Every structure is written in C-alpha cells, then in structure tokens.
C-alpha cells in the first residue's frame, strides 16, 4: 500500500508528467544579482511550479524500485517526506499582483499544473468546481530572465513581501526535513546489498538520478533562501560566488584532507600536497561543490599513498595538484603515487558501495553525502560517484586514469562558460 494515500498519489502521477526546467549558473546569477521584492516573487513562483514536479518524479523513482527496496523503512520514510513537502508547496496560495508591474511582467500567479490539478480534484470533490483560479491573465514566469523589474518604481504590497518571507520559511523547513534523505537512501541500499550481495545497473542509474536531483533541489532551495533571508555578501549572489578563488578552495580542501589523514593514521605529518595554480585564478561557481569534489579526491589520494608506502614509511611522495585555465574549462589534475587501481576495478570506482577501504564510521550520518563534510567517508563507497555528480551539475566532469603499481591521476573539469543547464532526468 502506498504511504502517500490515494489523493496525494494522484497528484504525484499528474505532476510527474510535466517536464522539469533546468537552470544554468549564469541564469541563477543574472536573476539574483540585483534582487527586488518583484524578482524574488517571480523566483518564488518559479519554485512553486518547479519543485513539486521534481519531487513527484523522485517519488515515482522510489516507487519504481524493486519490491524489496521500496518497502524498506527508510525509503518509505523518504517517500513520505517528499510527498509532504510536495503537498505543502502545492497548497501555498498566490497573491494579487501589483498593477505597477510592466506588461511583460504580468506572468501567471498560478503554476502551470494548477488547472490540471484542480480538474483532477474536482472529480473527487465537486464543491471545488466554482473555485476561482488566478491563472487566466498574462503569462507564466519564464527562465529567460531578460525582462526584469529592476528599477521599476513600485510600492510592493505587503501581501507580496509576506509571500516571499513565508515561502523562504517553508523552503527552509523543507530543506531541514530533507537533510537526512540522502543518507537514509544510502543506508537502505547498503542493507539491500548485505542481504542480496548485489547492486545491479538499475540501482546505479537510480542513485545517480536521485542524488543529482537532490543536488539540484538543494541548490534551488539554498539560493532562494539566501536571497530572501540572508544579508548580501560581497562577490556573492545567494550561495554562488562570482569570484571563487580556485587556489584558496583547493588549499582549504587540502588542509582538511591532511588533517583527516593525520587523525586516521596517527601521523605527525601527512603526505605533502603541492598546489601548482595561479593564486589569482577565479571563476563563478558554488564553492561548496568544488570543495566537496577536491576534498574527496585528495582524501582518497592521501589514503592510497599512506597505505601503499606503509604507515611507518620515512618518506611519502607528494600529491600534486595542477590547475590549468583553458578557454572553456578550468581543469584540476590531482596526481598521486599511491599504487593505482587495477584495470579490472576501474569501472567499479563509479559504482556506489564499491570501495577498497575498510569501513570507517562517522558520528554524523549527514557526512556520507554532505557537500560541506570534512569527515572520513572511507568504506562507504559514495565518495567518487558523488564527487562526479557535483562536477557535472553545472556542466563539468570528473575523469580518472590509473596506472596499477604506480598511482592515479584524476581530472576535474569546471565549465567556465557557466551556460550548461542542470542535467535533469
């Protein structure tokens, strides 16, 4: 039996049919660089439209898992959490638009799925048939952002300001509710593997899609909450840094990784990490995403180096981080002499749950999937697949080349053009 209930399940089935709308880093920055109550209202309407669609698709993915997986306690809890969040957004009411907005900004105040949803609900509740919808005028919010209300002389009504703050509060509640979602999925997948001793390709595809969607949802939530509720910061648009210093991010990730290495192996000094990078190199990026990927790779390189050469070794070869700036990409190459990976195991490094390390428990389960984590993940097998998803989210990539018996090179590609939309499925 569905944990959602019949009515909510029908809403999921309806909303999941609508296409998702992917945004690029450039769009997010352009729209949020000079926020006004009007632009934030437009962003809120977009999220009120988009988030239920994304949540509905993930609910369906969870429901399409094998009977054993979809009946597990944590996965059922995730379905319920997503369903609750979706319904809370659906039930959020719009406001009357200010008349001072220019003609191009008179977008719909109701989501594009609202009329279809109402038609579905009327079948079960005829009393809704006379409900007035405010979606008959103008056009809906678009992601072309070229028409903004910056500079419009308008006394924004209190109802609009209240919508912005209330919606930010709701999204923050949803973000907190979903904090444990990814780790709950991971733990049930882990339990499933223990019981069946297998992770087939369909589960791999599901996890890639689920975690990529989670990155996107949390990105949209965090960006809107930051724009509405947090004081502006220099060189930031919401959570996006317009001048992310690549050297400083790598340096911070390196220090954290070395600290973890010293703790894990009881070393006085961890292997050296040499950074060859222009200290002034900057780009527009989400710093936590890059930090997550670099930290994960460096942590793996440090572990491989220490274990290959022995904890009691008098000398560890340095790990080298080389950064190159191209016309389209900034590429970060991380090279170690940690013994490499066998050719047979290369395809498996992208598989969730595959690891060459013994399990290391953490105090906080969030650390398994957190973009801000500096806690050991060795033994869970999520590190490399998640790091690759973070780099791919805005059009980059992560590649690995290994020489068994010597070491491994990992390439992190960052898209400088910032025009790639989210890879939604």
UniProtKB/Swiss-Prot annotation:
GO terms classed as biological process: aerobic respiration; regulation of acetyl-CoA biosynthetic process from pyruvate; regulation of glucose metabolic process
UniProt name for this protein: [Pyruvate dehydrogenase (acetyl-transferring)] kinase, mitochondrial
Lineage: Eukaryota, Fungi, Dikarya, Ascomycota, Taphrinomycotina
Predominant cellular place of this UniProt entry's protein: mitochondrion
Classification via Gene3D superfamilies: Alpha-ketoacid/pyruvate dehydrogenase kinase, N-terminal domain (1.20.140.20), Histidine kinase-like ATPase, C-terminal domain (3.30.565.10)
PROSITE patterns noted in UniProt: HIS_KIN
Entry-linked InterPro entries: AK/P_DHK_N_sf, BCDHK/PDK_N, BCKD/PDK, HATPase_C_sf, His_kinase_dom, Sig_transdc_His_kin-like_C
Subcellular compartments: Mitochondrion matrix
Gene Ontology CC, one term: mitochondrial matrix
Catalyzed reactions: L-seryl-[pyruvate dehydrogenase E1 alpha subunit] + ATP = O-phospho-L-seryl-[pyruvate dehydrogenase E1 alpha subunit] + ADP + H(+)
Claim: Aminoacyl-tRNA synthetase is one of the keywords in the record: no
Documented EC number(s): 2.7.11.2
